[in-house]
Protein backbone atom coordinates (compact mmCIF):
# COMPACT_ATOMS: atom_id res chain seq x y z
CA UNK A 1 0.00 0.00 0.00
CA UNK A 2 1.19 3.52 -0.74
CA UNK A 3 2.44 5.48 2.26
CA UNK A 4 2.16 9.17 3.10
CA UNK A 5 4.58 11.81 4.27
CA UNK A 6 3.95 11.37 8.00
CA UNK A 7 5.38 14.80 8.72
CA UNK A 8 2.04 16.29 7.66
CA UNK A 9 0.47 14.54 10.64
CA UNK A 10 2.61 16.68 12.96
CA UNK A 11 0.90 19.85 11.77
CA UNK A 12 -1.56 21.51 14.08
CA UNK A 13 -5.23 21.04 13.23
CA UNK A 14 -5.44 23.77 10.61
CA UNK A 15 -3.44 26.54 9.03
CA UNK A 16 -4.30 29.79 10.81
CA UNK A 17 -6.21 31.58 8.08
CA UNK A 18 -8.43 28.65 7.03
CA UNK A 19 -9.40 28.31 10.70
CA UNK A 20 -10.36 31.98 10.78
CA UNK A 21 -12.41 31.46 7.62
CA UNK A 22 -14.14 28.45 9.18
CA UNK A 23 -15.21 30.44 12.23
CA UNK A 24 -16.34 33.40 10.14
CA UNK A 25 -18.31 31.15 7.80
CA UNK A 26 -20.03 29.47 10.74
CA UNK A 27 -20.96 32.87 12.16
CA UNK A 28 -22.26 34.30 8.89
CA UNK A 29 -24.27 31.15 8.20
CA UNK A 30 -25.97 31.55 11.58
CA UNK A 31 -26.24 35.34 11.15
CA UNK A 32 -26.83 35.97 7.43
CA UNK A 33 -27.68 39.65 7.94
CA UNK A 34 -24.48 40.48 9.80
CA UNK A 35 -22.24 43.00 8.02
CA UNK A 36 -18.85 41.49 8.76
CA UNK A 37 -15.74 43.62 8.18
CA UNK A 38 -12.59 41.56 7.62
CA UNK A 39 -9.32 43.03 8.85
CA UNK A 40 -7.70 39.64 9.31
CA UNK A 41 -5.88 38.08 6.37
CA UNK A 42 -3.54 40.52 4.65
CA UNK A 43 -5.34 40.60 1.31
CA UNK A 44 -5.54 43.87 -0.59
CA UNK A 45 -8.84 45.46 -1.60
CA UNK A 46 -7.96 48.33 -3.93
CA UNK A 47 -7.79 47.89 -7.75
CA UNK A 48 -4.57 47.15 -9.60
CA UNK A 49 -2.70 50.28 -10.71
CA UNK A 50 -3.88 51.54 -14.09
CA UNK A 51 -0.38 51.24 -15.56
CA UNK A 52 -0.32 47.54 -14.66
CA UNK A 53 -3.79 46.91 -16.06
CA UNK A 54 -2.93 48.64 -19.32
CA UNK A 55 0.32 46.67 -19.64
CA UNK A 56 -1.49 43.38 -19.06
CA UNK A 57 -4.19 44.31 -21.57
CA UNK A 58 -1.51 44.98 -24.17
CA UNK A 59 0.16 41.69 -23.27
CA UNK A 60 -3.12 39.89 -23.89
CA UNK A 61 -3.22 41.48 -27.34
CA UNK A 62 0.36 40.30 -27.86
CA UNK A 63 -0.85 36.76 -27.25
CA UNK A 64 -3.39 37.18 -30.05
CA UNK A 65 -0.79 37.96 -32.71
CA UNK A 66 1.48 35.29 -34.16
CA UNK A 67 4.36 37.78 -34.31
CA UNK A 68 4.21 38.67 -30.61
CA UNK A 69 2.75 35.46 -29.14
CA UNK A 70 4.68 33.98 -26.21
CA UNK A 71 4.73 30.34 -25.21
CA UNK A 72 6.91 28.98 -22.43
CA UNK A 73 9.02 31.73 -20.94
CA UNK A 74 12.29 31.40 -19.03
CA UNK A 75 11.77 29.70 -15.68
CA UNK A 76 13.80 32.43 -14.01
CA UNK A 77 11.63 35.22 -15.45
CA UNK A 78 11.97 37.47 -18.47
CA UNK A 79 15.20 39.47 -18.57
CA UNK A 80 13.38 42.79 -19.09
CA UNK A 81 11.56 42.41 -15.75
CA UNK A 82 14.58 41.14 -13.84
CA UNK A 83 16.65 44.07 -15.10
CA UNK A 84 14.02 46.61 -14.01
CA UNK A 85 13.87 45.04 -10.55
CA UNK A 86 17.66 45.02 -10.19
CA UNK A 87 17.90 48.66 -11.23
CA UNK A 88 14.98 50.15 -9.28
CA UNK A 89 14.73 47.98 -6.16
CA UNK A 90 18.36 47.20 -5.46
CA UNK A 91 20.98 49.13 -7.41
CA UNK A 92 19.16 52.42 -6.76
CA UNK A 93 19.66 51.75 -3.03
CA UNK A 94 23.33 50.88 -3.42
CA UNK A 95 22.82 47.11 -3.35
CA UNK A 96 25.08 44.91 -5.45
CA UNK A 97 22.39 42.76 -7.06
CA UNK A 98 22.33 41.94 -10.77
CA UNK A 99 19.44 40.73 -12.90
CA UNK A 100 20.70 37.14 -13.17
CA UNK A 101 20.47 36.78 -9.38
CA UNK A 102 16.73 37.58 -9.43
CA UNK A 103 14.24 34.75 -9.91
CA UNK A 104 10.62 35.65 -10.73
CA UNK A 105 7.95 33.46 -9.13
CA UNK A 106 4.22 33.35 -8.41
CA UNK A 107 4.55 34.20 -4.71
CA UNK A 108 7.00 34.71 -1.88
CA UNK A 109 4.91 32.34 0.25
CA UNK A 110 5.79 29.61 -2.26
CA UNK A 111 9.43 30.60 -2.39
CA UNK A 112 9.98 30.71 1.37
CA UNK A 113 8.72 27.13 1.49
CA UNK A 114 10.33 25.86 -1.71
CA UNK A 115 13.76 27.22 -0.79
CA UNK A 116 14.03 24.33 1.66
CA UNK A 117 14.39 21.99 -1.34
CA UNK A 118 18.02 23.01 -1.72
CA UNK A 119 18.99 22.64 1.96
CA UNK A 120 19.72 19.50 3.96
CA UNK A 121 17.63 18.12 6.81
CA UNK A 122 20.37 18.42 9.42
CA UNK A 123 20.31 22.22 9.64
CA UNK A 124 19.38 23.98 12.87
CA UNK A 125 16.58 26.42 12.06
CA UNK A 126 15.72 29.61 13.93
CA UNK A 127 12.40 31.47 13.74
CA UNK A 128 11.04 34.36 15.73
CA UNK A 129 8.03 33.82 17.97
CA UNK A 130 5.50 35.07 16.93
CA UNK A 131 6.22 34.33 13.27
CA UNK A 132 4.55 34.02 9.86
CA UNK A 133 3.19 30.44 10.11
CA UNK A 134 4.45 29.37 6.68
CA UNK A 135 8.06 29.37 7.88
CA UNK A 136 7.29 26.84 10.58
CA UNK A 137 4.76 24.68 8.76
CA UNK A 138 6.91 24.17 5.67
CA UNK A 139 9.78 22.98 7.85
CA UNK A 140 7.42 20.56 9.58
CA UNK A 141 6.26 19.25 6.19
CA UNK A 142 9.87 18.84 5.07
CA UNK A 143 10.74 16.71 8.09
CA UNK A 144 12.98 19.28 9.76
CA UNK A 145 11.22 19.19 13.14
CA UNK A 146 9.99 16.93 15.86
CA UNK A 147 6.47 16.94 17.27
CA UNK A 148 4.75 20.00 18.73
CA UNK A 149 4.51 20.44 22.50
CA UNK A 150 1.44 21.65 24.40
CA UNK A 151 2.27 25.26 23.46
CA UNK A 152 2.51 24.40 19.78
CA UNK A 153 6.31 24.68 19.65
CA UNK A 154 8.01 22.09 17.45
CA UNK A 155 11.03 20.14 18.58
CA UNK A 156 14.14 20.90 16.57
CA UNK A 157 13.33 24.57 15.95
CA UNK A 158 15.05 27.39 17.80
CA UNK A 159 12.41 29.95 18.81
CA UNK A 160 13.52 33.55 19.28
CA UNK A 161 10.88 35.37 21.38
CA UNK A 162 9.86 38.87 20.37
CA UNK A 163 7.72 41.06 22.60
CA UNK A 164 7.15 44.62 23.72
CA UNK A 165 10.07 44.15 26.14
CA UNK A 166 12.55 43.80 23.26
CA UNK A 167 10.67 46.07 20.83
CA UNK A 168 9.64 42.98 18.85
CA UNK A 169 13.16 42.38 17.52
CA UNK A 170 14.81 39.11 18.47
CA UNK A 171 18.07 38.86 20.34
CA UNK A 172 20.97 37.29 18.46
CA UNK A 173 21.11 33.62 19.56
CA UNK A 174 23.86 32.56 21.90
CA UNK A 175 24.35 29.24 20.10
CA UNK A 176 24.95 28.41 16.45
CA UNK A 177 21.98 28.11 14.11
CA UNK A 178 22.22 27.36 10.40
CA UNK A 179 19.10 28.83 8.79
CA UNK A 180 17.53 32.05 10.10
CA UNK A 181 14.14 33.48 9.11
CA UNK A 182 13.85 37.26 9.41
CA UNK A 183 10.90 39.35 8.23
CA UNK A 184 11.03 43.17 8.18
CA UNK A 185 8.81 45.11 8.27
CA UNK A 186 7.57 42.29 10.42
CA UNK A 187 4.52 40.16 9.91
CA UNK A 188 2.68 40.01 12.29
CA UNK A 189 4.00 42.69 14.68
CA UNK A 190 4.71 45.56 12.28
CA UNK A 191 8.18 46.03 13.82
CA UNK A 192 11.05 47.37 11.72
CA UNK A 193 14.79 46.75 11.75
CA UNK A 194 17.60 49.30 11.70
CA UNK A 195 20.77 48.85 9.68
CA UNK A 196 22.72 48.39 12.90
CA UNK A 197 20.42 45.57 13.98
CA UNK A 198 20.62 43.77 10.63
CA UNK A 199 24.40 44.19 10.69
CA UNK A 200 24.45 42.13 13.90
CA UNK A 201 22.64 39.31 12.09
CA UNK A 202 24.89 39.50 9.04
CA UNK A 203 28.00 39.42 11.23
CA UNK A 204 26.57 36.45 13.14
CA UNK A 205 25.74 34.57 9.93
CA UNK A 206 29.17 35.20 8.44
CA UNK A 207 30.87 34.05 11.64
CA UNK A 208 28.86 30.81 11.83
CA UNK A 209 28.38 29.94 8.17
CA UNK A 210 24.64 30.53 8.54
CA UNK A 211 22.12 31.55 5.87
CA UNK A 212 19.53 34.29 6.48
CA UNK A 213 16.15 34.02 4.76
CA UNK A 214 15.11 37.67 4.60
CA UNK A 215 11.42 38.24 3.85
CA UNK A 216 11.00 41.82 2.61
CA UNK A 217 7.42 41.46 1.38
CA UNK A 218 6.42 44.71 3.11
CA UNK A 219 9.50 46.84 2.42
CA UNK A 220 7.51 49.27 0.25
CA UNK A 221 5.66 50.47 3.35
CA UNK A 222 8.84 51.87 4.92
CA UNK A 223 8.69 55.67 4.95
CA UNK A 224 11.51 56.30 7.43
CA UNK A 225 14.56 57.13 5.26
CA UNK A 226 16.96 55.72 7.86
CA UNK A 227 15.54 52.19 7.68
CA UNK A 228 16.89 49.59 5.23
CA UNK A 229 14.57 48.11 2.59
CA UNK A 230 16.88 45.21 1.71
CA UNK A 231 19.26 42.96 3.60
CA UNK A 232 21.77 43.71 0.82
CA UNK A 233 22.11 47.27 2.09
CA UNK A 234 24.23 45.63 4.80
CA UNK A 235 27.87 44.93 3.99
CA UNK A 236 28.55 41.20 3.75
CA UNK A 237 24.93 40.17 3.22
CA UNK A 238 25.63 38.84 -0.29
CA UNK A 239 27.63 36.09 1.35
CA UNK A 240 24.98 35.01 3.85
CA UNK A 241 21.45 36.00 2.77
CA UNK A 242 18.61 35.15 0.39
CA UNK A 243 15.91 37.80 0.01
CA UNK A 244 12.23 37.31 -0.84
CA UNK A 245 9.97 40.05 -2.21
CA UNK A 246 6.47 40.29 -3.64
CA UNK A 247 4.29 42.53 -5.79
CA UNK A 248 1.25 41.45 -3.76
CA UNK A 249 1.00 44.22 -1.21
CA UNK A 250 2.67 47.19 -2.87
CA UNK A 251 1.01 46.78 -6.29
CA UNK A 252 -2.03 44.69 -5.37
CA UNK A 253 -0.94 41.45 -7.08
CA UNK A 254 -2.49 39.05 -4.55
CA UNK A 255 -4.89 37.83 -7.23
CA UNK A 256 -2.49 37.99 -10.17
CA UNK A 257 0.59 36.48 -8.48
CA UNK A 258 4.12 37.75 -8.99
CA UNK A 259 7.10 37.78 -6.65
CA UNK A 260 10.86 37.41 -6.68
CA UNK A 261 13.71 35.77 -4.85
CA UNK A 262 17.30 37.01 -4.87
CA UNK A 263 20.06 34.41 -4.61
CA UNK A 264 23.51 36.03 -4.93
CA UNK A 265 26.03 34.11 -6.98
CA UNK A 266 28.56 34.59 -4.18
CA UNK A 267 26.40 32.65 -1.70
CA UNK A 268 27.53 29.13 -0.81
CA UNK A 269 26.74 26.33 1.62
CA UNK A 270 28.44 23.06 2.47
CA UNK A 271 27.94 19.73 0.71
CA UNK A 272 28.23 16.45 2.62
CA UNK A 273 31.86 16.13 1.51
CA UNK A 274 32.68 19.55 2.97
CA UNK A 275 32.96 21.36 -0.35
CA UNK A 276 31.37 24.76 -0.97
CA UNK A 277 28.41 24.73 -3.36
CA UNK A 278 26.88 27.80 -5.01
CA UNK A 279 23.27 28.11 -3.90
CA UNK A 280 22.40 30.07 -7.06
CA UNK A 281 23.14 26.96 -9.13
CA UNK A 282 20.98 24.77 -6.89
CA UNK A 283 18.04 27.19 -6.90
CA UNK A 284 18.33 27.64 -10.65
CA UNK A 285 18.27 23.85 -11.07
CA UNK A 286 15.31 23.54 -8.72
CA UNK A 287 13.29 26.21 -10.52
CA UNK A 288 14.16 24.85 -13.97
CA UNK A 289 12.91 21.42 -12.90
CA UNK A 290 9.84 22.22 -10.80
CA UNK A 291 8.59 25.58 -12.11
CA UNK A 292 7.46 26.71 -15.55
CA UNK A 293 7.69 30.43 -14.86
CA UNK A 294 5.18 33.22 -14.30
CA UNK A 295 2.88 34.08 -17.20
CA UNK A 296 4.04 36.62 -19.77
CA UNK A 297 0.92 38.72 -19.17
CA UNK A 298 1.54 38.98 -15.42
CA UNK A 299 5.22 39.79 -15.84
CA UNK A 300 4.33 42.64 -18.20
CA UNK A 301 2.02 43.95 -15.50
CA UNK A 302 4.82 43.74 -12.95
CA UNK A 303 7.22 45.50 -15.31
CA UNK A 304 4.77 48.43 -15.49
CA UNK A 305 5.24 48.98 -11.75
CA UNK A 306 8.60 50.54 -12.65
CA UNK A 307 7.24 53.01 -15.21
CA UNK A 308 6.85 56.61 -14.00
CA UNK A 309 3.08 56.19 -14.01
CA UNK A 310 3.31 52.85 -12.23
CA UNK A 311 5.61 54.22 -9.54
CA UNK A 312 3.23 57.09 -8.83
CA UNK A 313 0.20 54.80 -8.71
CA UNK A 314 1.93 52.29 -6.43
CA UNK A 315 2.91 55.08 -4.06
CA UNK A 316 -0.73 56.15 -3.93
CA UNK A 317 -1.74 52.61 -2.96
CA UNK A 318 0.92 52.40 -0.26
CA UNK A 319 -0.07 55.79 1.16
CA UNK A 320 -3.71 54.70 1.19
CA UNK A 321 -3.02 51.58 3.25
CA UNK A 322 -0.61 53.40 5.57
CA UNK A 323 -3.32 55.96 6.28
CA UNK A 324 -5.63 53.06 7.14
CA UNK A 325 -2.95 51.79 9.52
CA UNK A 326 -2.66 55.22 11.13
CA UNK A 327 -6.41 55.37 11.69
CA UNK A 328 -6.45 51.90 13.26
CA UNK A 329 -3.45 52.60 15.46
CA UNK A 330 -4.63 55.99 16.71
CA UNK A 331 -8.27 55.02 17.26
CA UNK A 332 -7.39 51.92 19.26
CA UNK A 333 -4.69 53.71 21.26
CA UNK A 334 -7.15 56.50 22.09
CA UNK A 335 -9.59 53.85 23.30
CA UNK A 336 -7.01 52.57 25.77
CA UNK A 337 -5.45 49.64 23.97
CA UNK A 338 -1.70 49.02 23.80
CA UNK A 339 -0.81 49.12 20.10
CA UNK A 340 2.40 48.49 18.17
CA UNK A 341 3.44 48.66 14.50
CA UNK A 342 1.32 50.36 11.88
CA UNK A 343 3.85 53.12 11.08
CA UNK A 344 6.26 51.66 8.52
CA UNK A 345 4.10 48.58 8.10
CA UNK A 346 0.50 47.72 7.18
CA UNK A 347 -0.16 45.71 10.35
CA UNK A 348 -1.13 46.91 13.82
CA UNK A 349 -0.26 44.55 16.68
CA UNK A 350 -2.63 44.95 19.61
CA UNK A 351 -2.44 43.74 23.22
CA UNK A 352 -5.76 42.10 24.04
CA UNK A 353 -7.69 43.87 26.82
CA UNK A 354 -8.65 42.51 30.24
CA UNK A 355 -6.40 39.46 29.95
CA UNK A 356 -8.46 37.91 27.16
CA UNK A 357 -6.80 35.16 25.16
CA UNK A 358 -6.17 35.84 21.49
CA UNK A 359 -8.98 33.57 20.30
CA UNK A 360 -11.39 34.85 22.96
CA UNK A 361 -10.79 38.39 21.72
CA UNK A 362 -11.27 37.17 18.14
CA UNK A 363 -14.63 35.65 19.05
CA UNK A 364 -15.64 38.73 21.04
CA UNK A 365 -14.98 41.05 18.11
CA UNK A 366 -16.68 38.73 15.63
CA UNK A 367 -19.81 38.10 17.67
CA UNK A 368 -20.17 41.53 19.29
CA UNK A 369 -19.17 44.00 16.57
CA UNK A 370 -18.80 41.75 13.51
CA UNK A 371 -15.14 42.64 12.94
CA UNK A 372 -12.51 40.03 12.04
CA UNK A 373 -8.83 40.24 12.96
CA UNK A 374 -6.12 37.63 13.46
CA UNK A 375 -5.41 35.99 16.84
CA UNK A 376 -1.80 36.53 17.83
CA UNK A 377 -1.51 32.99 19.18
CA UNK A 378 -1.91 31.74 15.61
CA UNK A 379 1.57 33.13 14.94
CA UNK A 380 3.19 31.28 17.83
CA UNK A 381 3.08 30.78 21.58
CA UNK A 382 4.60 34.22 22.25
CA UNK A 383 1.74 35.78 20.28
CA UNK A 384 -0.80 34.73 22.91
CA UNK A 385 -2.52 37.77 24.33
CA UNK A 386 -2.02 39.77 21.14
CA UNK A 387 -4.11 40.41 18.05
CA UNK A 388 -3.17 41.51 14.51
CA UNK A 389 -5.31 44.01 12.62
CA UNK A 390 -4.65 44.53 8.92
CA UNK A 391 -4.81 47.87 7.13
CA UNK A 392 -5.75 46.16 3.88
CA UNK A 393 -9.36 47.23 3.37
CA UNK A 394 -11.39 50.16 2.13
CA UNK A 395 -11.28 53.44 4.06
CA UNK A 396 -15.00 53.20 4.77
CA UNK A 397 -14.64 49.70 6.23
CA UNK A 398 -11.64 50.65 8.35
CA UNK A 399 -13.41 53.69 9.78
CA UNK A 400 -16.61 51.72 10.39
CA UNK A 401 -14.68 48.90 12.09
CA UNK A 402 -12.89 51.32 14.40
CA UNK A 403 -16.17 53.05 15.22
CA UNK A 404 -17.79 49.73 16.11
CA UNK A 405 -14.89 48.56 18.24
CA UNK A 406 -14.26 51.78 20.15
CA UNK A 407 -17.92 52.65 20.74
CA UNK A 408 -19.21 49.18 21.58
CA UNK A 409 -16.45 47.47 23.50
CA UNK A 410 -14.97 48.65 26.76
CA UNK A 411 -11.30 48.37 25.92
CA UNK A 412 -9.33 50.41 28.42
Curated annotation (Swiss-Prot):
Kindly report, in one word, the top-level EC class recorded for this enzyme: transferase
Give the cofactors, semicolon-separated: pyridoxal 5'-phosphate
Q: Name one Pfam family in it.
A: Aminotran_1_2
Q: What is its EC number?
A: 2.6.1.83
GO biological process terms, semicolon-separated:
lysine biosynthetic process via diaminopimelate, diaminopimelate-aminotransferase pathway
Keyword Membrane (UniProt): no
UniProt-annotated binding residues for pyridoxal 5'-phosphate: 72, 108-109, 132, 187, 218, 246-248, 257, 292
Q: Which reaction(s) does the protein catalyse, per the Swiss-Prot or TrEMBL entry? A: (2S,6S)-2,6-diaminopimelate + 2-oxoglutarate = (S)-2,3,4,5-tetrahydrodipicolinate + L-glutamate + H2O + H(+)
Q: Which InterPro entries match?
A: Aminotransferase_I/II_large, DapL/ALD1, PyrdxlP-dep_Trfase, PyrdxlP-dep_Trfase_major, PyrdxlP-dep_Trfase_small
Q: Which GO terms describe its molecular function?
A: L,L-diaminopimelate aminotransferase activity; pyridoxal phosphate binding
Q: Which domain of life is it from?
A: Bacteria
Q: What is this protein called?
A: LL-diaminopimelate aminotransferase
